[in-house]
């Protein structure tokens, strides 16, 4: 899995507009982060996805987009890994 994560982070770093990313495990602990305040928000991202399960009929976590004046944050869960990506608006 480490190779797969490393490849994903390399691809993210090469995309235009990406200013940060954070990978979180199923306990809410930061596995890897890059960018401003990404690691300090790791538990928050995981908590948001856990709460989003109550908003869907299937009980699956929703994909979340947070839009601000300075960045758009995309949060998604795949298997047991939560990934957030911050991009310029």
From Swiss-Prot:
Part of the Ragulator complex. The keyword Cytoplasm applies. One of its GO terms (biological process) is protein localization to lysosome. GO terms for cellular component: lysosome; Ragulator complex. This is Ragulator complex protein LAMTOR5 homolog. Keywords: Cytoplasm, Lysosome. Its main location: cytoplasm. It is found in: Cytoplasm; Lysosome. Regulator of the TOR pathway, a signaling cascade that promotes cell growth in response to growth factors, energy levels, and amino acids. As part of the Ragulator complex, may activate the TOR signaling cascade in response to amino acids. Pfam families: LAMTOR5 (PF16672). Belongs to the LAMTOR5 family. The keyword Cytoplasm applies. It comes from the Eukaryota.
